[in-house]
């Protein structure tokens, strides 16, 4: 499925604790039998997320690369994506038949975006636990990502979040751009995200 332009590069961003690594794990497990998949994770001072994905057996360890960004994690996905582009180039060299590379950003704020030179498709993950007002706060991740994932919907009753309000606000803020509610712990919403990637990414 490798295109002439190389593998489909999917950027996964969102605040700390929103569920980016859980989403990356679920997507890898859902797609690895049909596609050649790899992951690049971004952490400021460690490769903890990459190590977590290896422990979760999301993919073989040679398909998971962790980069230490230092400083502000958004710089490595936006202003200067060199470290990530180099990691992808290394994966391409080792695994020439790659179809999809997931690029998981370090936890960041609502203003974080991926450089178009780095990601073909962007997914932004927020958590119900961050408050029902998060969708209406806006920011590029909320309004301009190709897909918004509102995760941990199962916890809404425990944190006083109204999913109907979040649905309404997300619809208003994103206009025609899609979003999905998910519960990564149970895998709820994963199939919708995979279908989105297949359709939008031409897989």
From Swiss-Prot:
**Positions bound to GTP:** 14-21
What gene is it encoded by? ureG
What's the source species for this entry?
Rhizobium etli (strain ATCC 51251 / DSM 11541 / JCM 21823 / NBRC 15573 / CFN 42)
Highest rank taxon of the organism = Bacteria
Q: How does it assemble?
A: Homodimer. UreD, UreF and UreG form a complex that acts as a GTP-hydrolysis-dependent molecular chaperone, activating the urease apoprotein by helping to assemble the nickel containing metallocenter of UreC. The UreE protein probably delivers the nickel.
Which Pfam families does the entry mention? cobW
GO MF, one term, reads: nickel cation binding
Q: Tell me its family.
A: Belongs to the SIMIBI class G3E GTPase family. UreG subfamily.
This one is known as Urease accessory protein UreG
Any one cellular-component term (Gene Ontology): cytoplasm
């Amino acid at each position: 499925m490798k295109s002439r332009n190389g593998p489909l590069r999917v950027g996964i961003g969102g605040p700390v604790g929103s569920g980016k690594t859980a989403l990356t794990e679920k997507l890898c497990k859902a797609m690895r039998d049909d596609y050649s998949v790899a992951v690049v994770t971004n952490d400021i001072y460690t490769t903890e997320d990459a190590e977590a994905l290896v422990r979760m057996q999301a993919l073989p360890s040679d398909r998971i690369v962790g980069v230490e960004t230092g400083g502000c994690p958004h710089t490595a996905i936006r202003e200067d994506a060199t470290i990530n582009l180099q990691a992808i180039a290394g994966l391409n060299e080792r695994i020439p038949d790659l179809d999809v590379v997931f690029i998981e950003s370090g936890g960041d704020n609502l203003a974080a975006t991926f450089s178009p030179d780095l990601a073909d498709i962007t997914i932004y993950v927020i958590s119900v636990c961050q408050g029902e007002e998060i969708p209406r706060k806006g920011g590029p991740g909320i309004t301009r990502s190709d897909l918004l994932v509102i995760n941990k919907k199962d916890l809404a009753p425990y944190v006083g979040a109204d999913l109907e309000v979040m649905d309404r606000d997300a619809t208003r803020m994103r206009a025609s751009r899609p979003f999905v509610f998910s519960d990564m712990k149970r895998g709820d919403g994963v199939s919708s995200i995979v279908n989105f990637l297949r359709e939008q990414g031409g897989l």
